[in-house]
Amino acid sequence: MCSSDLTAEKTKVLSAVRLPKDLAAHTARGQYAAGWQGSHEVVGYLDEKGINPASTTETYAAIRLDVDTRRWAGVPFYLRTGKRLGKRVTEIAVVFKRAPHLPFESTATKELGKNAIVIRVQPDEGVTMRFGAKVPGGTSMEVRDVSMDFGYGRSFTESSPEAYERLILDVLLGDPPLFPTTREVELSWQILDPIEEFWSTLGQPQPYRSGTWGPQEAVEMLARDGHRWRMP
């Protein structure tokens, strides 16, 4: 696969992204308030030096998107990003539906969650798989969540390059796959512009305490679809 193949696939995905019809129900925005970041007490966004006390700038955003392709039709994509959250982490979590029928009594699976594959991008690059396993021993059937974990740092002595190290190296080598093309940028803004325009009519974002995982709006957004955010 060469850089042009990767660019073509990224363009296909961006072209197939569909926004929710009800942006009020399937987007959330927030602005961090005072709280704790680790062991340090921190001020809220509006109290930061140089920030307009009436600023409506978001420091948190969450949205549901759909990808209108044969492979991903009907699969919701939930994206969230923010500042001053519980910790600094980037990951992709593929959470599977529970089977419509489990061949066990409900008491045997009451502690069983949904299977998931989590791709950790940073800071601890790796992959975690979560699935159900029978608790050994005993005469009764009990199934609980267990995890299998792979980490690059634990499996290899070589360290992965930092994000900007890789970008700078690609610039020197003239290798462009990680850089968005003009078309990719245009398609990205076609997704974001309607959301920004809608949010501009809402006034002040909902505050959330520093060190938490975002505003209550984001929790309610997923709850409407019968889901909840995964805690990294």
Identify the function of each model-found stretch.
Residues 4-232:
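Secretory/organelle targeting and membrane-embedding segments
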